[in-house]
Amino acid sequence: MSKTTTKDLRNLSDSEMSDKIQNLRKELFDLRFKQATRQLAKTHRFKEARTELAQLLTVSNERSRSNTSS
């Protein structure tokens, strides 16, 4: 998976962003489950998913704050 930049994330529509957030949360849940059952091979995916989720939530919060202040 290529690294997603915040510039790319800012170009997403609100619906695309919410879909990505939902998918990443599901992926993190699945990763935690696989790790608990010792089936996880790519442990680095935890950090990547958490980072991308944080970036998406940051951009989402920026949008909501700019909409309320305007």
Swiss-Prot record:
GO biological process: translation
Disulphide bridges, residue numbers: none
Claim: Cell membrane is one of the keywords in the record: no
Gene3D superfamilies for this protein: 1.10.287.310
InterPro entries documented for this protein: Ribosomal_protein_uL29, Ribosomal_uL29, Ribosomal_uL29_sf
GO MF annotations, alphabetized: structural constituent of ribosome
This protein's UniProt keywords: Ribonucleoprotein, Ribosomal protein
Highest rank taxon of the organism: Bacteria
SUPFAM superfamilies named among the record's database cross-references: Ribosomal protein L29 (L29p) (SSF46561)
GO cellular component: cytosolic large ribosomal subunit
Family annotation (CDD domains): Ribosomal_L29_HIP (cd00427)
Family, similarity comment: Belongs to the universal ribosomal protein uL29 family.
Protein name, per record: Large ribosomal subunit protein uL29
Organism of derivation: Prochlorococcus marinus (strain NATL2A)
Gene transcribed to yield this protein: rpmC
